[in-house]
Amino acid sequence: MPRYKLTIEYDGGPFCGWQYQTNGPSVQGALEAAVKAICGDDVRVHGAGRTDAGVHALAQVAHCDIARHFMPDRLRDGLNAHLRPHPIGVLEAEIVPDSFEARFSARRRHYIYRIANRRANLAIDVGRVWRVPRPLDTEAMHAAAQRLLGKHDFTTFRDTECQAKSPEKTLDQLDVIRNGDNVSIITSARSYLHSQVRSMVGSLVWVGHGRWNADDLSGALAARRREACGPVAPPDGLYLARVDYEGSIPLRQDR
C-alpha cells in the first residue's frame, strides 16, 4: 500500500482547526472526505502540525496510505477537484517510504505571524493578519525576542489545556522584521507547546508598545506561570510556513 506525502495550504478561518472535530469543519476532515471521494475508502490523513481554529498554512505536510496506486500529479489534481469550495489547496503529492511520518519525522517547523501595524482598517487581509493600530518598536521587540532562544521551560507561554508531557522546548529562531506597515514574526523550532507562538507574539507586542522591556519578558519566562504571560495574539495572523525533514534545504531569513 503506497504512502503519500501531501503539501497543503489553507485558509484556517472557516475551520475549527486541523484536527477532526465533531462540533465543526476541520481541515483534516475535508481532506479525508476528498480522499474517500477518489478511492472509496476511509483513509486517515496525518498532519505535521495540529493548527488551531483560524490558523493558516502555507505548506502544511500530511501523509496517508491509499490502497490504490495513483500517479502523484493525478492524486494532487483529484484532491483539489474534490476539495472545492473549501479554501484548501494541495500543492504537491509524492510517494514516500513507509517509514515517513508527517509529524514524527519532522526536524523543524517554521511559523510566521503577520501584523498590520497601521491605523487604517483592513480591507484585503481581514482574517489573515492582526491589525495593531498603535506604533510598534520592532527593534525592541526583536532584541527582547532573543531572550527566548534556546532550551527553556515555556510554561508561561503554554495554554492551560496543553497536553504535552513536558513544558521544555528549544526555540531556534525568533525574529521580528518590519517592512513598512507590515511586521513579520518568524520562528523556528522542532516542536511547540499549545498556543506557544501566539503567546510569545502577544507578549512581544507589549514590548513593542513599551509596556514591557526585555527584562520583563525574561522575567515572564522565568516565572513559569501562565498568569505571567502577556496577551495571546489572535489566530488570524499565524501561518504554518514550512516543515523541514531530513534532507530539506535550510530556510534562510535575512533581517
Curated annotation (Swiss-Prot):
Family from the record: Belongs to the tRNA pseudouridine synthase TruA family.
GO molecular function: RNA binding; tRNA pseudouridine(38-40) synthase activity
Top EC category: isomerase
Catalysed reactions, semicolon-separated: uridine(38/39/40) in tRNA = pseudouridine(38/39/40) in tRNA
Name this protein carries in UniProt: tRNA pseudouridine synthase A
Organism: Nitrobacter winogradskyi (strain ATCC 25391 / DSM 10237 / CIP 104748 / NCIMB 11846 / Nb-255)
Key words, A-Z: Isomerase, tRNA processing
PANTHER family linked: PSEUDOURIDYLATE SYNTHASE, TRNA PSEUDOURIDINE SYNTHASE-LIKE 1
Known partners and oligomeric status: Homodimer.
Database matches in HAMAP family: TruA
